[in-house]
Amino acid sequence: MLGEFELVVLLAVLRLGDEAYGGSILEEIARRTRRPVARGSVYITLDRLEAKGLLGSERGDPTPIRGGRAKRFFRLRPRGLRVLKRTLADLGRLQEGLAVLREGLMGA
């Protein structure tokens, strides 16, 4: 099973498709979770997911706006998609039948 932030990063990469690079992934996570996200955490997690074989990456063309640096674009590999689907299914089974999730914690 994936860790929580690994799951969030993979979902962001999947959602962004061809536009999944470090900055866009960070913005997508912050916007969707409404939580601050540390740039270093995103890049460390991307590197770890790539080392696990769940993500692939390639460099785009250098741009003057980035001081001549190229963006590094990420994509889910087939194994990454399988692990993502399995993790989401596992989480779904874990929360099945938990009335507290339907009714709110302690009636809140």
Give short role names for the model-derived ranges.
Residues M1-S41:
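N-terminal helix-turn-helix DNA-binding core of bacterial DNA-binding proteins
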Residues L10, F73-R75:
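Short aromatic/hydrophobic contact patches that present stacked aromatics
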Residues I29, T33, R59-D61, P78:
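Short, well-ordered turn and helix-capping elements at secondary-structure junctions
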Residues V42-L49:
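Basic amphipathic alpha-helical segments that dock to polyanions
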Residues K52-G67, R75:
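Beta-hairpin "wing" of winged helix-turn-helix
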